[in-house]
A protein has these predicted regions:
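N-terminal periplasmic "start-of-domain" segments of outer-membrane beta-barrel proteins
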Residues: 32-63, 97-100, 107, 112
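Short acidic/polar hinge/loop motifs at secondary-structure boundaries
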Residues: 78-80, 107-136, 156, 180-183
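Surface-exposed extracellular loop regions of Gram-negative outer-membrane beta-barrel proteins
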Residues: 107-108, 359-365, 420-423, 427, ...
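A beta-strand signature from Gram-negative outer-membrane beta-barrel systems
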Residues: 124-166
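Transmembrane beta-barrel wall of Gram-negative outer-membrane proteins
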Residues: 212-312, 342-345, 504
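Outer membrane beta-barrel strand-and-loop segments of large Gram-negative receptors
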Residues: 398-402, 436-443, 447-454, 546-548, ...
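Gram-negative outer-membrane beta-barrel transporters
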Residues: 465, 477, 579-581, 600-683, ...
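C-terminal beta-signal and adjacent terminal beta-strands/loops
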Residues: 628, 675-682, 703-752
């Protein structure tokens, strides 16, 4: 029966809109002119948003070039109602990353994180994209698992032959030409015994096995400026065109962090000063091959590799344990992603098949606690039983297929998505300098699979000035996570959902004005990690993260109203009002019973929550050489947990983006400003207040000079360099303070 339902939802045939103009006369051959319009200019993006049946916002590569933004994560914060956490995770209309989804071309992107439902947008460089569109109201032909925004990233297209080279360098006020520490990662020995065999080994054998682990020394050196480079070329030959683009980047970041927590309003639990050294290396390649004939076909493949090498020194006092602390950690994260998709248009049909591979390795996460008794004149020593060496690997394969067909104004369609994930970890601590003790638990591995069959019917019709887009989407989901408890007994989490998701989009179109109304039902499903009975210790956050097998999906009801005005080409003014009602929202909370020195973060479903707000956007060309833009979002939310009311986790009360552009001949000068209101970083409990992230002002300045065959860009990032602060309202104290550096970058692009 389950298989039948999946097949039934995949059978409906889906539609596509043809960009084809056909000229036919008697006794003449039929001529078909096909084009692939490039949406890279600011005007083209405004026109796309204006014509769209759903409420959306977006940004083009032409606009991104006027900013210091190097990754999609940097660029997204320029879009109305969008904020970014940690330079990579997205919040839309104040909703945390888990309420948002992302697509690369026509394929849903997987979560890149082992401990949350989130895509790391800093993985994709802006050099590989043409535009980003964010849908904020739903339609039947879109995936149903989102509420804040559906981010649709379009990679580069080619319309003529070209060859481009880019070279760049960057300077950080805190990190460049400074003393830096790093340590090499260590692969897990291939001949090391299994957990069971190691545990039953004698001490002599354990010492021999322990020698297989390398103990690399800490490297100390002066940093060099950040470097990046790339090349891309396009080739057009008749009906075929191809594009290849590749880029590499190396960066150094140094953060000084103050970290503390309290047992009471005045009594400290710990007080640390951390220095965090991060070296990042990334490489990206994009290959597109397109056939433009009577029918069109395209193959698009993106390959990304990113490696983060982190080392941290921690000094301070732990008053709970009565210790002076002089500890260090090293961590390595390797992400490898392949996204490949093949799509085609055949008359009134279109189809898409895709494959995603996501590999994430954490080779040799090491914690080395060095302590002495507080206030005692004695040497520091390693607390062996608190040492930590951790290896983990996660792989996720996903396969998807969609087929569409249109019958005039009626569109029907269906699709299928399959995801398979495996996660495994090995954890050790030292009993002495030459012998490891394995502390891996049965909960430290899980497998998961996800099946989603979908089908929809959509009606898109114009009645004079009124345009109607309405439909029903049905999604049938099978969701399984398998792990073990501490005793070794299997623990399985199985979910089966059948969801009917109606949507209605109305627009009333005048010559320069548009009125929009939207109603829809969407949902938020738990991520594999959020329901897996697996605890992971995060030394940087000083907290453990644990899944909740009882976590349920959230149903969300959305209402949107929008007024749009387009005075002139490239100009727009808009006002949006929106509201959302959540049934069983999903949130990350601090578990009851946690103490500041041992926080436990997990996930829960409060009964209900709501969110409402207003968005304003203004873009005006004042003169031929001067234009201004601003977008502002003001929001409020409320969730009631056992009679205690608070805002949703991750939701800010306001978001502000503003900027000015000056253009004179071949020179462009841009100033961009961004500010996000305070938001809950982690939800507390009775006796332990919520942890808030404070707002800060971000100012960027860019100078762009057009050359005969290229351009040169000078960018000043985060000019104010204000620190990030985390605090608790009731205590009115800073728990965490992280410095943010000012940056200068210089980039040269040449078209050869």
């Amino acid at each position: 029966m389950k298989l039948f339902l999946l097949l039934l939802l995949c059978v409906p045939l889906l539609s596509f809109s043809q960009d084809t103009i056909t000229f036919k006369e008697q006794n003449l051959t039929e001529f078909i002119i096909k084009s692939v319009p490039k949406k890279i200019s600011e005007v083209s993006i405004i026109n796309t948003i204006r014509r769209s049946s759903v409420i959306s916002d977006g940004i083009s590569i032409d606009f991104i070039k006027k900013t210091p933004d190097r990754t999609v994560g940097d660029a997204l914060k320029r879009i109305s109602g969008i904020t970014i956490q940690n330079d990579k995770f997205i919040l839309v209309r104040g909703l945390a990353d888990r309420y948002n989804s992302a697509m690369l071309n026509k394929t849903l992107l997987p979560s890149t994180e082992p401990d949350r439902r989130a895509f790391s947008f800093d993985i994709i460089p802006t050099a590989l994209i043409d535009n980003i569109i964010v849908s904020k109201s739903a339609s039947a032909n879109q995936p149903g698992d989102w509420s804040g925004g559906l981010v649709q990233i379009t990679t580069k297209e080619v319309s003529d032959n070209f060859f481009n080279i880019s070279l760049g360098s960057g300077w950080g006020s805190v990190s460049t030409l400074k003393d830096f520490k790093s340590i090499q990662s260590t692969a897990f020995p291939s001949t090391f015994p299994s957990t069971y065999n190691y545990r039953i080994s004698g001490n002599g054998d354990k010492r021999l096995f322990t020698k297989q682990f390398n103990n690399p020394i800490v490297e100390e050196f002066k940093t060099i400026p950040n470097l990046n480079g790339g090349l891309s070329f396009g080739y057009v030959n008749g009906k075929f065109n191809s594009l290849f683009s590749s880029s590499i980047r190396n960066t150094f970041t140094l953060n000084n962090i103050e970290r503390k927590d309290y047992q009471s309003s005045t009594e400290l639990a710990y007080d640390y000063k951390d220095i965090l050294y991060t070296k990042r290396s990334s490489s990206n390649s994009l290959f597109n091959l397109t056939y433009l004939g009577k029918n069109t076909y395209s193959l698009k493949t993106l390959v990304n590799y990113q490696k983060d090498n982190t080392y941290m020194d921690r000094n301070g006092k732990n008053y709970d344990n009565i210790q002076d602390v002089h500890s260090n950690l090293s961590n390595h994260i390797n992400n490898f992603i392949i996204n490949s998709q093949f799509d085609g248009n055949i008359k009134t049909w279109d189809f898409n098949v895709g494959y995603n591979l996501m590999l994430r390795e954490q080779p040799d996460y090491r914690v080395n606690p060095i302590t002495k008794s507080l206030g005692v004149n004695e040497p520091y020593s390693t607390a062996w039983r608190d040492t930590y060496r951790f290896w983990s690997g996660m792989d996720e394969n996903s396969f998807n297929g969609n087929i569409n067909k249109s019958f005039g104004n009626i569109k029907i369609g269906g699709g299928y998505l399959k995801k398979i994930r495996g996660f495994d970890a090995r954890i050790f601590r030292y009993l002495s300098t030459d012998m490891l003790d394995e502390i891996t638990n049965n909960t430290d591995r899980y497998t998961a699979d996800f099946d989603l069959g979908s089908g929809y019917v959509m009606w898109d019709k114009e009645f004079g000035l009124l345009k109607l887009n309405t439909g029903i989407r049905t999604e049938y989901n099978l969701f399984n996570v398998s792990t073990s408890d501490f005793s070794g007994s299997k623990v399985k989490v199985n979910r089966e959902y059948l969801d009917v998701l109606p949507s209605l989009n109305l627009s009333y179109n005048l010559e320069k004005t548009k009125y929009r109304f939207s109603l829809s039902k969407t949902l938020a499903r738990p991520e594999f990690r959020e329901v897996a009975n697996f605890a992971y210790y995060d030394f940087v956050r000083n907290a453990q993260l644990l899944g909740n097998p009882n976590l349920e999906k959230s149903d969300i009801y959305n209402l949107d109203l929008k007024w749009e005005l387009y005075p002139k080409t490239g100009e727009n003014i808009s006002v949006s009002v929106f509201g959302k009602n959540f049934i069983k929202p999903i949130e990350q909370i601090v578990a009851d019973g946690s103490v500041p020195s041992n926080l436990l973060l997990t996930y829960s479903n409060p009964d209900k929550a709501y969110l409402y707000g207003v968005e304003l956007e203004f873009r005006k060309k004042v003169t031929d050489w001067f234009d201004v833009y601003t977008n502002t979002s003001i929001m409020n939310s409320e969730v009631n947990v056992n009679g205690i009311k608070r805002q949703l986790q991750g939701q800010s009360n306001y978001v502000l983006n503003s900027g000015v552009n000056f253009k004179k001949k071949n020179n462009i000068f841009n100033i961009s400003y961004n500010k996000v209101g305070s938001r809950i970083s982690a939800v507390g409990f009775q006796g332990y207040p919520d942890i808030f992230e404070n707002s800060r002002d971000i100012l960027d300045v860019t100078i762009l000079h057009k050359l005969k065959n290229g351009e040169i860009k000078l960018a000043f990032g985060d000019v104010f360099g204000q620190p990030s602060k985390y605090y608790q309202n009731l205590r009115n104290i800073n728990l965490i303070k992280i410095n943010n550096e000012q940056t200068i970058s210089l980039t040269l692009n040449l078209n050869l």
